[in-house]
UniProtKB/Swiss-Prot annotation:
Organism: Rhizobium johnstonii (strain DSM 114642 / LMG 32736 / 3841)
NCBIfam families: PRK00147.1, queA
Pathway membership, UniProt: tRNA modification; tRNA-queuosine biosynthesis
Protein family: Belongs to the QueA family.
Listed name of the protein: S-adenosylmethionine:tRNA ribosyltransferase-isomerase
Role of this protein: Transfers and isomerizes the ribose moiety from AdoMet to the 7-aminomethyl group of 7-deazaguanine (preQ1-tRNA) to give epoxyqueuosine (oQ-tRNA).
Record GO biological process: queuosine biosynthetic process; tRNA wobble guanine modification
Amino acid sequence: MRVDLFDFDLPDERIALRPAEPRDSARLLVIDPNAENSLSDHRVGDLTSFLRAGDALVFNDTKVIPAQLEGIRHRDGAGGQQVSATLHMRTSPSRWKAFAKPGKRIKQGDRISFGHSGESCFLGSLDATVEEKGEAGEVTLLFDLSGPALDEAIAAVGHIPLPPYIAAKRPEDERDRADYQTIYAREEGAVAAPTAGLHFTPGLFEALDRAGIERHFVTLHVGAGTFLPVKADDTADHKMHLESGYVSAEIAARLNAVRERGGRIVCVGTTSLRLIESAAEESGEIMPWAGATGIFITPGYRFKAVDMLMTNFHLPRSTLFMLVSAFAGFETMHAAYKHAISTGYRFYSYGDASLLFRKDR
């Protein structure tokens, strides 16, 4: 499909720079393409009204790490140059793939010392070698540290990698360390939050428990590739960046039991959905799964296991707007976003939420 079919105009004032307080007071646009009135306006706190006892919410429990690194590039015969790197996928205990700027001036073999003046980890400076250089500013960094020592060093000198549409308007601050993390995050490795989960509070969890709605957790480490624009003119020519994760055998069995009892699988966030669909057989059975997924969902995709999706409002021409268009219908989602813009919904990572029912085949 032509990528420009997924374009729309979004006024700057619709981009949220801070989350709603409290989190579950954010607005919730319910989108049911199978209903006569497909759109209705609510609050996230109303979520239990649209779920049934025996349904299962699937959360992504990845935890955002301070993956934005600032440093100085060193090269024989050349002076130091300031560079930045956003880590997006770990490939070994001492290696990370990253998006580096300025990408054109970084070469294989360069040494980079990360951390501003006065910043250091408990073992000193955080240094790496550019082991490989790929396309679009992507590099493979081989750090001098490894394993837990590297983790602690990154935590000491790194910064929360705010999405570019927020970072362009304000700097990261201490509030973001809490705001840009779900209350159930536990598996470190993401460089972007699974933002649909940001709306959940302990009180909302209690309400879900009282309603008999199950909660299950999977892990997909969201990479910085989620923010990359689609530069191709046709979706067939776009290549997704890989993201690593897993679905345990225990969780797969529990979700299959939910489906067998007639319950619905409700994914909280596109990352949970992409992981479950990667793990599902054509029959809909969810299998234990571990690895890297580059699943790219566009209209025409046949969903195998997911019945409902809670997600924030996404960028024009993005792979995520393509995904929701595949899930609830292309025309329905364009109408929903038009309604959201005209009625003041807040967009993107810190914005409001939508609850989508899967379009009947």
